[in-house]
Amino acid sequence: PGSRIVLLEQEPALTRFTTLRDYATAGDVTVHEVVAIADQIGIDLDRESATASGGERRRAAIARALAMDPDVLLLDEPTNQLDLSAIEWLEDWLSRYTGAFIAISHDRTFLTRLTKSTIWLDRGGIRRKDIGFGGFDAWTDEVYAQEARNAERLDAKLKLEEHWLLRGVTARRARNEGRKAKLMEMRATRAAMMGPPGTS
């Protein structure tokens, strides 16, 4: 409660603003802070919004978002359409930023340099680990390897239980009925197991 959350959109809506300055200074921002950030990131705020390039629009959006003094920054593809100098400037700013930020990005270098925690949307589920993106590949390999080991163990146990069932259950003893129920449960568990994406 009381935290200021600011979204840096992937495609800022500039159609109702004549200039980048009009856009960047709209809302609850300090104009001199916007101008200072714009100077640092290298954007001419007097450019007309309609003719500004994607990179210029992105820089104006960054100046606006950072000047809002957020507690939490939501970054949607923050390095998209930026040149190397602007990306480096943003990385430097974020490395000194004392608030929190959540980034959705395909820029692996950006994520590796700045992140401390990773959320992985995996086959319909969510996983979280306190590692930066630099450790993501090792983490996924570890998860998939553990899943494969679990599946192998379950397959071996299923094979034994299926063999027991095929030999025939001679009596309706509670023990046998319980074992059959457990077998059905194992079958369902195995059927629900998914391999890594791209496997069947």
Describe each PLM feature range.
Residues E142-S200:
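Flexible nucleotide-interacting loop at or near the entrance of a catalytic core
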Residues P1-A151, S200:
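ABC ATP-binding cassette signature C-motif
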